[in-house]
Amino acid sequence: MLWELLFIVLIVLVGAFVQGASGFGLGLVVMGFLPFMLSVQESTLLVLSFLAATALTILIKNYRSVQLKGLIMFVVASFAGRILSFFVLTTYGDMDILKTWLGVFLITLVVYLYFNNKRNVSLKKINKLVPISLGVLNGFFGGLFAVGGTFLVVYCLYLYKEDKHRYTANVQIVTLMTSSFSLLLHGVNGDFDLSFLLYFAVGVVSVIVGAVLGLRWFEKLPASMIRTIAMLLVLLAGLNLILFS
């Protein structure tokens, strides 16, 4: 049990640091490793709670930059995706095959992020289907694997590419809203137990410390460097999930 708690502290600390410094990444980093110890459902619920805590910590500093205009359709679509993922997770969340699917999805995201960083997409190309489709994807994969933030980041980069403070603030407010919604659904369904409370109590300390440290580096360290390191970790974790789950 002691080693399990130390493991959670370490990976959550790294994930929260990445989230604080670059705006996203906690879900990717932690979900790449936590399923080695817990089921996918248990891992997802923990990471969703950590995401909500991290987002709230970051928002305390950046709340003045929140501007939800342009995100309403995205958020509504995300809620729809969260409802769908809730039924999938509660039905298949304890199956080991879901860990393999998670590994494949993580590697796919890493490849997508690598090539997407080389492209420069204009906001003028966005139509109404973009926030709806990205919102549903964010909601579904965020609720299923707690790693849907990539779709949120892509959309917010379109909207706030010239203002990194507004970008990170709006990513966090949407993350807080959608994560809290998923946790509410699972809470009503009775999916939490005492072990969850123990893991959360230990991990939330790492969340706060990691997010605060990440925010300090937010102004100094290139976000691209932090994301690159995080993506390498996620790539290795995804391969491990496929090969050894």
Predicted regions and their residues:
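Transmembrane helix exit motif
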Residues: 56-65, 101-126, 215-216, 238-245
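Loop-to-transmembrane alpha-helix entry segments
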Residues: 67-73, 91-106, 119, 220-228
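Membrane-embedded helical hairpins/re-entrant loop segments and their flanking transmembrane helices
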Residues: 108-168
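Interfacial loop-to-transmembrane junctions
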Residues: 212-234
